[in-house]
Amino acid sequence: MFHGDYMTGLNTFLDYDLSRDHARMGIGAEFWRDYLKMDANLYHRLTNWKNSPDLDDYEERPADGWDLRMEGWLPSYPQLGAKLEYEQYYGNQVALFDTDHLQSNPRAVTTDLTWTPFPLMTVSAGRRQGQNSHFETEFGVNFTLNPDLTWQQQTDPAAVAAMRTLAGSRHDFVERNNNIVLEYRKKTVIAIALPERVEGKSGMQYPLSVSHAHTGRQPA
């Protein structure tokens, strides 16, 4: 909804992973104006525990969570921008980064710098800082083809300024995490050991050895 020099909005999403049969609902809110975007998102699982293809003897389900995002550009040099994101997810063993680093109620802060020399291309460099000194450094080059613009407009550096205005960004996608973050838990596996050969008289009792088995790939 437009309010003069700024825009507010609400959105809902249904995320579904065909390969794992996981579903998640997302609710978001945004506040945009010239050279500034602010977004907030809430993620809530719709499916429960399923066998995990990532870790042996583990189950997985979508993790509940939320994030806050802010992105801005310099009015005097709209090609240069910066992003700041805070994200928080809940669960005892959540793979916010990867399955080798499962964490309890993990959170992370992401900072990015972007440079758009012309509308067709954006170069980015960022750092995602999590708990326990865990971090990721990312570099990327993104190409965005807009069918409403001519090739000359998409390669014109002067056209970048219009992209940073409220009118120029009204068709942009909302900012959210489209990847479903998963929570894991270890299944209880019971092993019963039987002797290879049993000898005795009728009516005799023999003990069975029962133990918890811990086999398969484990998280680091």
Where are the model-predicted features located?
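Transmembrane beta-strand segments that form the barrel wall of outer-membrane beta-barrel proteins
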Residues: 1, 7-17, 27, 38-45, ...
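N-terminal "first-domain core" detector
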Residues: 31-40, 73-78
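A generic structural signal for short, solvent-exposed coil/turn residues
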Residues: 2-4, 30, 74, 115
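Short, glycine/acidic-rich beta->alpha junctions
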Residues: 18-23, 104-105
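Short glycine/proline-enriched turns and hinge-like loops at secondary-structure junctions
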Residues: 6, 21-23, 134-137
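Flexible, glycine-rich linker and terminal segments associated
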Residues: 46-83, 87-103, 108-110, 114-124, ...
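Glycine-rich loops and low-complexity Gly/Arg-rich segments
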Residues: 4-6, 34-40, 95, 148-152
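Contiguous hydrophobic, core-forming segments of folded domains
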Residues: 21-35
